[in-house]
């Protein structure tokens, strides 16, 4: 007789109401949109927990009106990992292997080097953890070159079984979260902006699920093709 408890869970996300908040011209950083989506994820999925490596105010990962998870409070839904990116992802791996929870934890994209070994293991074990990584370009503010990610995006994309999504606006951000929360085998890195980006006219939820799509077709003769992702899509559309 099998007396084991099955902790496997299915998480999902309905973004229909969220999308109404992001009309064409809506101007905000995708890290802020991500925070709004996280609240909806938490509302729709009681087994969802969110954390960060001591960067909650910058990466926008905190579930509002929820306590911190601790030995004194197992009901807390915010995970406080400290400045330990490798330990953060390793802990997420262990909790996900146990099953029963869906985990997200964020940091700066430039610090993804610190957790590379742990996220590589997550990919090998097909653990659907979520990593919202903000400050995705040279537009990171006053911190300078030490906080400007250059090679990290390519590094994450090169890991087999790793999903890397860099949304260009709020609509794509919500769509990216839907893919991440409904993933059952792939770790997902969500690459977020610090600076504001405008919601574009032809942003597509379905297009995000395909990995890439044409957001602006040529009007007449095609002289060149501009390929962009994330915050550069706004710039490309103005070129």
Regions found by a protein language model. Name each.
Residues 2-239:
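Thiamine diphosphate
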